[in-house]
C-alpha cells in the first residue's frame, strides 16, 4: 500500500507493513528481517518533511503502541509508549496534574518521532521535547531490547538520534506541574518583528512571529506562563473557531490552493492575508495555547543560526525572496 508523508514531500511502497503491540514483537520483527538481509524502517505520523520514514522493505507502523505506561508523581516523570501521539498526551497527564514543559504548535507527531527529529517549541529557557527525556527503551538493529537510563551516556543520542541507534519503543519524560499560558497576538510590520525579535525572545517566556512574504505584514505571538489556577479568558469558542478553523485553515487553504495553481496570484493573496491580521489576547491551558490547528498542508525547512545573527539572516532571506521572485505565502520564526 502506498505511503506518503504529511507534507507530501516523500512517498514509498513498502513490501510489508507491520503494526507491533510491544517491544517483544518489535524485537522479533527486527531479528527475522535481519536474518534474511532486509531492513526495517519505523514510522509514526509521517510529519517529518525529510525522507527519514521512507521504507522500501518493512515499514514498522508504531500506531498500535500508544498510551501511558507509568507515572512517578514525586519526580514528575511519565513513561509513554513510543507511538503515543502528542495530542493524546495532555489527557493522559491531566489526572496527575502534569503537563509537558514545552510544545510546538503542531501536535500530530508521535512522541518518539517528535524527540527523534528534534521537534521543539519556543522560549530561550526551554529546550525541545528531546531535552526532557530521562530514559528510553530501544530495540537495536540486532533485535536486542535495551533500557537506557538517565545516567547512560547514550541517552542524549537515543533521545535525538533520528532512529540511528534503534527503534525507541517507550520513553520517559520529565514533566512539570500543569500550567496555563496567557497569549498576546499582535499584528506588526515585518521590520518591527525582525528588529525587535532579540529583545522579545530575551524578555518573554515564549515569542514567535509569522511574516507574510511580498508584504510588510507580520503577526507576533507572545506567551506568558501562569499557574494552573489562572482564569481562562479570551474570545468565545465560536470566535476562536471562526479565527482558527474557518479563516486560518479553510479560507486560507482555498487561497493557498489558488496560489499553487496560479503562482502569479501569490503576492496578491499575501497582501489580502496580511491585511486580514488582527490582534487578540487569551488565557488557557498550556496545550491549548501552544498548539494550533494546522489542516493546510505546507512544506518547511529549518536552520540553526547564532541567536544574535537571526535579524540579519531574516533580512537577507526577505531580500532574497524579493530578488529571486520566489512565490511564498508565509514564513515563521520560532
Map each language-model feature to its residues.
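Glycine-rich N-terminal segment of FAD-binding domains in flavoprotein oxidoreductases
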Residues: 8-105, 118-123, 209
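Solvent-exposed alpha-helices and their adjacent loops that cap or buttress functional pockets
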Residues: 9-11, 51-53, 70-73, 109, ...
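Flexible, glycine/proline-enriched loop segments at strand-loop-helix junctions
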Residues: 15-16, 75-80, 103-106, 123-125, ...
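Generic non-transmembrane alpha-helical segments
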Residues: 32, 36, 312-325
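Structural signature of FAD isoalloxazine-binding scaffolds in flavoprotein oxidoreductases
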Residues: 50-69, 123-142, 167-174
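C-terminal substrate-binding/cap subdomain adjacent to the FAD-binding core in PCMH-type
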Residues: 116, 134-320
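Conserved small/polar residues in nucleotide/adenosyl-binding loops
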Residues: 330-334
Amino acid at each position: 500500500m502506498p505511503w506518503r508523508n504529511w507534507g507530501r514531500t516523500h512517498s514509498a511502497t513498502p513490501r510489508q507493513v507491520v503494526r507491533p503491540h510491544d517491544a517483544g514483537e518489535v524485537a522479533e520483527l527486527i531479528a527475522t528481517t535481519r536474518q534474511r538481509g532486509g531492513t526495517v524502517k519505523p514510522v509514526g505520523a509521517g510529519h517529518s518533511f525529510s525522507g527519514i520514514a521512507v521504507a522500501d522493505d518493512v515499514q514498522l507502523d508504531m500506531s498500535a503502541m500508544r498510551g501511558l505506561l507509568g507515572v512517578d508523581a514525586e519526580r514528575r516523570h511519565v513513561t509513554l509508549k513510543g507511538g503515543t501521539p502528542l495530542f493524546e498526551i495532555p489527557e493522559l497527564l491531566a489526572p496527575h496534574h502534569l503537563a509537558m514543559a514545552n510544545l510546538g504548535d503542531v501536535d500530530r507527531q508521535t512522541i518518539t518521532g517528535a524527540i527523534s527529529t528534534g521537534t521543539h517549541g519556543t522560549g530561550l529557557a526551554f529546550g525541545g521535547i528531546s531535552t526532557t527525556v530521562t530514559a528510553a527503551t530501544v530495540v537495536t538493529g540486532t533485535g536486542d531490547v535495551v533500557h537506557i537510563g538517565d545516567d547512560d551516556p547514550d541517552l542524549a543520542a537515543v533521545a535525538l538520534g533520528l532512529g540511528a541507534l534503534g527503534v525507541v519503543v517507550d520513553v520517559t519524560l520529565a514533566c512539570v506541574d500543569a500550567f496555563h499560558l496567557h497569549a498576546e497576538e499582535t499584528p506588526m510590520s515585518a521590520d518591527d518583528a525582525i528588529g525587535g525579535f532579540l529583545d522579545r525572545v530575551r524578555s518573554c517566556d515564549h515569542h514567535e512571529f509569522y511574516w507574510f512574504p511580498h508584504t510588510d505584514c507580520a503577526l507576533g505571538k507572545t506567551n506568558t506562563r501562569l499557574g494552573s489556577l489562572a482564569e481562562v479568558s479570551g474570545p468565545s469558542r465560536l470566535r476562536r473557531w471562526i479565527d482558527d478553523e474557518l479563516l486560518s485553515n479553510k479560507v486560507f487553504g482555498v487561497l493557498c490552493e489558488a496560489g499553487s495553481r496560479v503562482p502569479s496570484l501569490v503576492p496578491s493573496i499575501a497582501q489580502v492575508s496580511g491585511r486580514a491580521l488582527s490582534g487578540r489576547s487569551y488565557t488557557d491551558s498550556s496545550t491549548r495555547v501552544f498548539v494550533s490547528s494546522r489542516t493546510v498542508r505546507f512544506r518547511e525547512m529549518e536552520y540553526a543560526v547564532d541567536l544574535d545573527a537571526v535579524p540579519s539572516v531574516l533580512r537577507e532571506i526577505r531580500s532574497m525572496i524579493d530578488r529571486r521572485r520566489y512565490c511564498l505565502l508565509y514564513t515563521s520564526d520560532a
